[in-house]
Amino acid sequence: MSTSAIALALSSSKAIEQLDHVQTETPNLKQEMSESPSNSGVASKRKLQSTEWLDPELYGLRRSGRTRSNPGRYVDTDDQEDVFPSKHRKGTRNGSSFSRHRTIRDLDDEAESVTSEESESDDSSYGGTPKKRSRQKKSNTYVQDEIRFSSRNSKGVNYNEDAYFESFEEEEEEEMYEYATEVSEEPEDTRAIDVVLDHRLIEGHDGSTPSEDYEFLIKWVNFSHLHCTWEPYNNISMIRGSKKVDNHIKQVILLDREIREDPTTTREDIEAMDIEKERKRENYEEYKQVDRIVAKHLNSDGSVEYLVKWKQLLYDFCTWEASSIIEPIAATEIQAFQEREESALSPSRGTNYGNSRPKYRKLEQQPSYITGGELRDFQLTGVNWMAYLWHKNENGILADEMGLGKTVQTVAFLSYLAHSLRQHGPFLVVVPLSTVPAWQETLALWASDMNCISYLGNTTSRQVIRDYEFYVDGTQKIKFNLLLTTYEYVLKDRSVLSNIKWQYMAIDEAHRLKNSESSLYEALSQFKNSNRLLITGTPLQNNIRELAALVDFLMPGKFEIREEINLEAPDEEQEAYIRSLQEHLQPYILRRLKKDVEKSLPSKSERILRVELSDLQMYWYKNILTRNYRVLTQSISSGSQISLLNIVVELKKASNHPYLFDGVEESWMQKINSQGRRDEVLKGLIMNSGKMVLLDKLLSRLRRDGHRVLIFSQMVRMLDILGDYLSLRGYPHQRLDGTVPAAVRRTSIDHFNAPNSPDFVFLLSTRAGGLGINLMTADTVIIFDSDWNPQADLQAMARAHRIGQKNHVMVYRLLSKDTIEEDVLERARRKMILEYAIISLGVTDKQKNSKNDKFSAEELSAILKFGASNMFKAENNQKKLEDMNLDEILEHAEDHDTSNDVGGASMGGEEFLKQFEVTDYKADVSWDDIIPLTEREKFEEEDRLREEEEALKQEIELSSRRGNRPYPSSAVESPSYSGTSERKSKKQMLKDEVLLEKEIRLLYRAMIRYGSLEHRYNDIVKYADLTTQDAHVIKKIAADLVTASRKAVSAAEKDLSNDQSNNKSSRKALLITFKGVKNINAETLVQRLNDLDILYDAMPTSGYSNFQIPMHVRSVHGWSCQWGPREDSMLLSGICKHGFGAWLEIRDDPELKMKDKIFLEDTKQTDNSVPKDKENKEKKVPSAVHLVRRGEYLLSALREHHQNFGIKSSPAISTNGKTQPKKQTANRRQSGKPNVKSAQKIESATRTPSPAISESRKKPSSKDTKIETPSREQSRSQTASPVKSEKDDGNVSLNAEQKARCKELMYPVRKHMKRLRKDSSGLGRAELVKLLTECLTTIGKHIEKTVNDTPSEEKATVRKNLWMFACYFWPKEEVKYTSLISMYEKMK
């Protein structure tokens, strides 16, 4: 029997339990009638239903487009009915009136109004992908979080580490109370099987025939678990839902038998299966226990029924039960319900003080109404501090170190408000989903007399809470004292919750508010409340900007905190500011540390265990570095953090386990010819990772010595690997990460903390499992991989090291030797200094800290270099791992008594700061020194072969796209010196000359925005993100695009002139396809280029603000501001300066003074929503759509004026038939108005109207120049030899033959030209001048030498062509070859 099958059995049973009884969510809200499931006369029960699936809006900030990896599924496609509860639940209460039926049915109407997204999601089975909709019946689906090779071998790769962890942070908070469903409607008067819970062997039978030998525990539709019955197969085979019994036989009974009879199954496997089965049965018994009486109803016959909420189930599983059934088993809960109904603490009976608060009186001892235990002295001080702030009408941050009982202090304070000050609420407490159980237990223990409700669950659950728990019957008076909810439901139901006037709002784990632009921050800021309290053990995690957000949330506008404090270069002003900030914040932040206030708490020690990498890890680590050699050497100069961060994430994965890379495990198993045996899989998991070898030895000893262990990792796939290892080793364990539903989390935590629990290990993700979870029954913490943020690791340690812990806590931090993990750990520790400098100490001079929470490119490079050189020297690592001695590693471990660390900090001790003094690694070595030349050459050769293959594939694809046309001869290669062979050059040419379809589309949009490349080359390539492409490639593609567009326009005009019946006003957009890019509007492109050319020519040189529109235009009507010729002129000036469509930049440009003329935020209308009258006063115009229309109209008016102006001044035609050149237009540019005397005719008066201006329009040339000037379009696409003289000071493209010749002649200085192109970015002014001088001098001398060796009749042409060729390599922007010659002459 394979390990996968064993895991399948365990997870199948888990899935059935989790889906059917804990995470239950009924997607449709529907109440119908049905009969009792039995003949005993038990009243049928009312069932409250759900309409909600997981809603992306629940998470506030945004939903990323990342692919989510779902756990593996087991699907039986043969069955038409699954083992899960049916979609439509029916039930009523005997004797209830029709009007009360209608009260519940009213929810149906709301369900029908749910958005289509939610409704469609409701049709999905649990765990299914919401994007796929189907009305067909779903096949049964199981969550297989323990099946090997499913989740951890997924193909999705995400190099963005923050986004990688964020996905699990988000999933951690999701609503996971789901119920897989059936779609078919059920007849009303029939019994229906909801879930098959269990089975038992009938006495006297051997179990060989399951359908005859077993009885099945059935939960009936619309009835609680209290009414489950044992039924033989024959009794239920004809009842609706009987297919679920067949599925249970196949997927539970037969599979269990198969595993037990398999000879490879161990006793540990069978024991684990039995333990899981017993745990499941215990949960079923818990579902029969009353959690809370929600409501009471008196029937017309005098009988009483109670609306019951059952333990571990949500409000949508509430059922109406007869008093005769409930009173014997829930007398305490009924009495609590009566006390709540008659409570003197009702909010309506409270006192409203407003802003005038009573005088503060210190609590000398614990009040009698604070029950549940005895507060420690420091906790009573915390209650007094919160009370003192309340009396002063101030807000504060309770920032005690993790594990000091911030929850207890907060609950005690709220109880103080209710009893001592008659502030009966309502109070709002917002907490993370994972801490809800802890808050519920604390509230029940320490404030049992307050009416506290948990606002959780799906749509129906929350609706039931609002209907029965929010208000006193028949009134709008608040009924509860305290509402406990999570961040997600605050966002989901902000419209409901924000309308309640809260007397006090407490927010747990408040560092979630560190981003002042988040939806959660915005929503909570709008809540109406008298006072606020933020609860966080880490008030400052990364930088002071986060603290500023928290303080501004508490006291808006009261403090102004700088977003950056540079502790590396302190000055007197900064020192004074930090002292002042510390003094001002001190009254509002209470922070105590364990060592100072809790002397009885056992100590905590941390040991860093360094371990060698395995051979497979070494292989991957070196390959990652070598394959990214080019990125490593270039990222510093280019300032690219993203590329380096990707490499860092990959190296961290290699440092943990090579199985984190796709396909590695399969390759290794094939290499050893594995048959998939248990011992082979286990050996691969352990021996291929140095950390796993160490962990295996460490866990063996800890198990023997009776310790219990928490293992933390950042990576969920790493938890998958650890889970497989623990299962194969037979170690009982629990798991909690962002993919585990909330209800299952609570069950797992309770099972681990239960007395005599068999669980040995608890696997947790650092981010999802490090918040507010109490696991103090463990005394050992293993941090498998350190977090970037040291506070996350401290949170993880605090799960075990907290009040109530009786044993010394040992923390083991696993670290791969000579890898980036060592440097990341040291750098992450430095972040802690800032917190103590601002929060605790007010330190001003000796400490160092990063300015922000993001690593720069230089820092990332230094991290990557740490230990990299040793990686290429290490040998025999696998032998070292096989011979590992645990005692020796523990003996040489680096010890840290972290309790003393923070204690020294709170007292302002110098010892604390000394412990953060680290030796900086000298990162002044180059990657050439680190990565051996042989390694680089090997991978360079592989890259070269791969590039050739890709180029060949691209050539084949391009040929098929273009109809197998030969590549145009004018498409010459970019200057490249990667090889000298003819075959290589052609492939390199093909690669350089082709832009991706996405790049071409961006180039098209940039030209629509800015016009021709001749005027705005830099703006266009920047907008299109083509700065890394060769200039002549971009020009060539742009020229081809313009040519294709002009041809399409000409053809369309010709067709239009031939078809006289065609109505011009009904013409459609002229869309063409260019190099695979579809929907390019040829007419718009040609027209825009022409219009912007005219606009550029009309713009004066004296400044954009001096431009005046030279013609009369029609005025605007109905705009919200005064708009006249000045505004039209400035709009055109803004288009010329910033581009067509850059309305935001135009509005904010102080030179144009259009700030009060453009209203982008006020209106976001479509073309059909432009107001035609003045009634719509709340929307101001012009908005973007109006500006587009006005801009197009003004450009057309300017074009028409230009055409008419040209017609009046016809140019003289020479005798040889050539048009005389235009005169200089300097005067016109200076005045901003056209000069009539200097204008010449550019087109015939009989020209056919066309959106495109004639291509023969010439640019003005110098007055002394007698040589004919080619048109702008001709010069852009020209392939013949240049005809302009050197005096013209312009560049003309070289043709293919000329470029090939120049490339050959300039080969000796190719390195200097490449340095000009690549090495100039990111340099300072001095370094740039030095580089340009060196390279330009060398290139110039070579050109002079080459020209001297050339025949005299060719010298001028060769000299000009070589300098023009050198222009291609000039950094960043275009330069004319004559300018290069001039610079070189000055340098000589």
Swiss-Prot record:
The lineage of its organism: Eukaryota, Fungi, Dikarya, Ascomycota, Taphrinomycotina. PROSITE patterns: CHROMO_1, CHROMO_2, HELICASE_ATP_BIND_1, HELICASE_CTER. Keywords: ATP-binding, DNA-binding, Helicase, Hydrolase, Nucleotide-binding, Nucleus, Phosphoprotein, Repeat, Repressor, Transcription, Transcription regulation. It is an enzyme of class 3 (hydrolase). Residues 22-147, 956-985, 1163-1184, 1205-1299 are annotated as: Disordered. Involved in heterochromatin silencing. Required for transcriptional repression at the silence loci of mat3, where it has a direct role as a chromatin remodeling factor. Residues 107-123 have a biased composition (Acidic residues). GO terms for cellular component: chromatin; nucleus. Residues 387-557 form the Helicase ATP-binding domain. It comes from Schizosaccharomyces pombe (strain 972 / ATCC 24843) (Fission yeast). This is Chromodomain helicase hrp3.
